[in-house]
């Protein structure tokens, strides 16, 4: 890990953020690495609302990230909302940076147990469904969809061109 690493973690749940902050600080202590961990509690609604502010006010400095990883969120959101978030995230990725979003595939062998025993309902997406969430400004050749070894978890990877 490089010395100039800054991690910004965003979630709507304060307990989740505190748990991750503590875990990363423990790793930082044990490894002797120096990196910054910032957490921010925001809802999806807040992210979307805040993304409109720069266009209105024009005075907010735009932050850029080398890597944005959105996991465990799109399984609960409509295609429309996911596309909005992907556009926002893509705008925040620095030229040459990587945006990754995950979703569970419909072939999940635990799907029925999750739904009927645990009342845990997800919005499942196939690889073409996930590909359809591509940000509007992202070139088609800049993305790919991969799966983990189980084939259940899909990853939409979008590399922003170095020229922006």
Briefly describe each language-model feature range.
Residues 64-65:
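Local beta-strand N-terminus motif with an aromatic residue
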Residues 77-78, 93-94:
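Helix-to-beta-strand junctions that scaffold the AdoMet/dcAdoMet cofactor pocket
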Residues 69:
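A conserved beta-strand element that flanks and buttresses the S-adenosyl-L-methionine
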Residues 52-60:
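Conserved amphipathic alpha-helix within the SDR
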């Amino acid at each position: 890990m490089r010395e100039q690493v800054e991690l910004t973690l965003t979630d709507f749940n304060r307990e989740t953020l505190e748990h991750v902050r503590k875990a990363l600080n423990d790793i930082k202590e044990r490894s002797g690495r120096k990196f910054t961990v910032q957490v921010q509690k925001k809802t999806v609604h807040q992210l979307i609302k805040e993304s409109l502010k720069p266009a209105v006010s024009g005075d907010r400095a735009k932050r850029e990230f080398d890597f944005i990883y959105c996991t465990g969120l799109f399984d609960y959101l409509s295609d429309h909302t996911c596309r909005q978030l992907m556009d926002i995230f893509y705008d925040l990725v620095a030229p040459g940076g990587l945006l990754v979003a995950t979703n569970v595939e419909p072939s999940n062998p635990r799907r029925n147990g999750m739904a009927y025993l645990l009342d845990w309902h997800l919005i499942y997406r196939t690889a073409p469904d996930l590909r359809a969430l591509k940000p509007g400004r992202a070139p088609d050749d800049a993305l790919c969809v991969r799966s983990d070894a189980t084939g259940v978890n899909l990853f939409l990877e979008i590399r922003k061109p170095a020229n922006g």
